[in-house]
């Protein structure tokens, strides 16, 4: 499990590969890790803008879980996001890359 600064550092360093391999246009960290409130059982919440190709989304999630050493909850940017989720991302979100 990584803390906020560790997650930001790891993801920032991996961003060229993530962009190229998975077609991710932007990534934001949000949730308990972004707020500095994570516990040992917390997952890492990431909001990404990427093409809607199911296999790539699944592959990215597995890659990120291996990279960060914990469970990753990957939320893709799309028009069906509920307003609560959008507000949480806007409130807590930390831009990793755009």
Model-inferred region functions:
Residues 1-26, 34-40, 50-98:
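Catalytic core of pol beta-like nucleotidyltransferases
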Residues 28, 45-47:
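Short, well-ordered beta-strand segments
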């Amino acid at each position: 499990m990584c803390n906020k600064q560790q997650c930001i550092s790891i993801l920032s360093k991996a961003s060229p590969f993530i962009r190229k391999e998975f077609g991710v246009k932007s990534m934001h960290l949000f949730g308990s890790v972004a707020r500095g409130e994570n516990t040992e059982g917390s997952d890492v919440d990431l909001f990404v803008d990427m093409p809607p190709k199911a296999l790539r989304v699944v592959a990215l999630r597995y890659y990120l879980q291996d990279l960060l050493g914990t469970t990753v909850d990957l939320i893709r940017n799309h028009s069906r996001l509920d307003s609560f989720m959008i507000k949480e991302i806007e409130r807590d979100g930390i831009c990793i890359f755009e």
